């Protein structure tokens, strides 16, 4: 019934009201929609917002995938919560099959060094612990900031150029 800012998939998401962004949840807008289930991102939603959602009596599913396989597991859990188990199983089977094909295609190649452009003001990318590195690794790429101890570091254009990425994402 509602989405977070910049939700663009599926295309119908653009037609739904925005009830959250990087600053947090718009509780007035959310409650007006009377949701049956709220999907939250453990790494992206503020803990106090998640606690408030629960205190309001809403059913909250907290997504916290750590691996690419976790995405399939969580999709099955959400499918069960929404009564769409068969559709969920079909989607996850397809997802896991395609993921395995991609991994096999790139596993023997040397990783391509990439700059993953995450945000512009300030310029941010992904470091060692960012989940996006798992996606990059599965298709034969690696962040030029993989050595950063910060998961989502702020960087300068000069730092990016010094690392000489072969590709900008």
PLM region descriptions:
Residues 4, 129-152:
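His/Asp/Glu-enriched short active-site or ligand-binding loop at hydrolase and phosphoryl-transfer sites
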Residues 27-34, 56, 155-164:
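Short helices/loops that flank or line small-molecule/ion binding pockets
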């Amino acid at each position: 019934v509602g989405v977070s800012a910049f939700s663009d998939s599926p295309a119908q998401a653009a037609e739904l009201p925005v009830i959250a962004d990087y600053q947090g949840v718009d509780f007035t807008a959310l409650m007006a929609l009377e949701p049956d289930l709220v999907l939250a991102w453990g790494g992206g939603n503020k803990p106090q917002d998640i606690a408030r959602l629960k205190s309001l009596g809403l059913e909250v599913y907290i997504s916290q995938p750590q691996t690419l396989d976790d995405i399939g597991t969580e999709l099955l859990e959400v499918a069960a919560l929404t009564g769409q188990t068969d559709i969920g199983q079909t989607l996850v089977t397809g997802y896991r099959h395609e993921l395995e094909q991609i991994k096999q295609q790139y596993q023997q190649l040397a990783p391509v060094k990439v700059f993953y452009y995450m945000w512009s003001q300030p310029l941010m990318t992904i470091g060692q612990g960012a989940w996006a590195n798992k996606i990059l690794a599965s298709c034969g790429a690696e962040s030029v900031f993989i050595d950063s101890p910060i998961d989502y570091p702020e960087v300068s254009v000069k730092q990016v150029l010094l690392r000489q990425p072969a590709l900008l994402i």
